[in-house]
Every structure is written in structure tokens, then in C-alpha cells.
Amino acid sequence: AVTNKNVITLEGSKSTGIFGENKSTLLNDATGNITLKDEASVGIFSKSNTNKAQNKGTILTEKKKSAGMFGSKGELENTNSITTTEEESAGMYVEHSKATNKKTILIKGKASAGVYAKLSDATGGTASGENEGTDAVITIEKEGSAGMLGEVKSTVATGTATTLTLTNSGNINVKTKNSTGMMLTNDLASLAKDNVKAENNGIITLESTTKADNKNIGILANKKATGINSETINVNTLESVGMLGQAASSVVNKKTINLSAEKGIGMLAKDTDSTATNEDTINVNGKQSSGMLAQTAGKAENKKSIIVTAESGVGIFVSDTGTGVNTSTGEITLENKNAVGIFAKNNGTTDHTAENAGKIVLGKADGST
């Protein structure tokens, strides 16, 4: 067993604060403080370990390509504080195992991740990342980053029992540009998108400090993956998207997406075999925003409620070869005179359609618009 109750400060590159394998008990205790001052360093490294490695103290990485905790076939848990300062770093990075954050992860460098789960070995298997409970907060402060990131690599053998899961029941706050709350990429051609899944049961907020903080995504199913929102996504940055499914991915909204900033999109389906399905509520409050967008052969379906209060807002926008459907159970409410229920652009051919089988309601129920 390795327990740190004091201060560990490492000056060199490729340093490790606490290391253990096999049946090691690794613990940075409540009074423990690990600081890594050079690049490619790790606070706690657990390898092929049957025991869970725990951080109950403070871990700080000061340079690039570093991780607060790294588990290679070793489970990780953070119940206190992890901060990464420079690029290409991860708060918690796990391969073929499980990482659980229950408290604070702060990411200050670009191209980084709060929790990163990966499958790359030929054997496949399972990997998972969890941001668990109301005290769990992941904050992203620099571009090109993800609160939670999951990847299945093509090096995994075809036919293996392989699943990768990300779950958030806490808070993910994105305070930058070109970043995502939760992101998944499945590079294994034979692996079904249902096996690579991200679910939000908490709150994802894309929040802006300046107008340059734009083009963020709440949940990105980047390739052959599934994204599910079962709680709240707040889109408060310009030109940003609540949920995006591309490259044969699916995204499903089962609760609430709030679009507050201009030129936002609630749900976007892009590319062949990609779908976006709204099963609850999308609130379109930002100017020139759309509840759903289907483009380049993607399909968007509204099965419940899209409420457009925004000026020049659109319920379902269908672009080029996309397909958009307001189904028989779908309702688009337009509470602004300049709003449009379903808008089709460059959709001349018979194959690519915008269809309304449900209700489009004009004006507020009280007749004030």
C-alpha cells in the first residue's frame, strides 16, 4: 500500500507521484498534496491493478501532456481536487477500466479532458467515465477540450465484447470555445453505436465569458456513437449546439435543451445514418437559432415539444440532403412573429424532405403574439 498524507513535489519530466500495480492500494489522502512541475507527468499511476486508486487530496499538474490520475487497467476515484494547467492533459485518464469523479476537476489548458476513457487493446472489454453526484464539477477553461471524452480505437479486435460509457450526474461547465461537454468517437467499424454511449443525467452548461467563446457542443457523438440527454443542457455561447450526432451517430433528448445565445442549434444530425430525436423539450430563445437541424443526409425527428420564442427562430431546419420530420406526437410552438416552424433550404429533390405530421402552433396560448 502507498499512502501520501504530505507534500510530493516532482521537478522532472515523465515523473509519477504514486505508482502501483497488481493488488496495490494507492491513496493520496485528504492532507496529501501532489504537484508535478514538468511535462508528461502523472500524479497517481495505477497499472493492471485490482484495487481502486483514490485521490482524497489535491493534485496539480503544471505542464503539458500530463494526467492527475492515470489508470491502465486500474480503477480511479477522485473525491477532492485535480487541476491540469497546460495542454494535452487529463484530470483522470483511464484505459480499459473505470474513472469516477465525485468532486472537482479543473482543466486550464487546451486540447485536454476532464475525464478521458479509452479502449485500444485488441482484447477490447469495457471502459467508463463517470462524473458522479451533485458535488461533481468538471470545468473546462481552454479551447479544443472536452469535459468527458471517450474513444474506442480501431486497434480493438473485431468481435470482442466491447463497451464504452460516459455518464454525468453532476455538472460540466464549458467556459471557452470549440469545446464539448461530453464527446465520443468510435473508430472500430464493426462496433455498433449502441456500445459507445454518453448520457447526461446532470447539467451541462456552455457558458460565455466573451463573445469569442463560441462554437461549443454539449454532447458530441462524433463517430458511430450514441448521445443521450436525460436532464439539462444549457447553450449560452454563440453558434453552439446542444447535441450533435455525426458520422453514423444518434443523439436523443429525453429532457431539456435551452438555447439562449444567438445562432444556436438544439440538436443536429449530420451524415448518412445519423439521427437526432427530440422526445421532450427544446427551448429556442436565442436569435436566429433552430431547435433541430438536419444536414448532409442526417435525419431530425421531433416527437414532443420545440418552443420558439426567438426572433428569426426555426423549429426544424432542413438543409441540403437532410430529412426533418415533426411527427404525429410533435408540437412546434412559435411565440415570435418572425419565427418559422419548419424551414427547408436547397431541398429540391423528392428524396430529401421536410415533413409535418404533427402540430405547429402559432402564438402564445394567451394570444399575446
State each model region's role.
Residues 1-41, 45-112, 116-179, 183-240, ...:
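Surface-exposed loop/turn motifs in large extracellular/passenger domains
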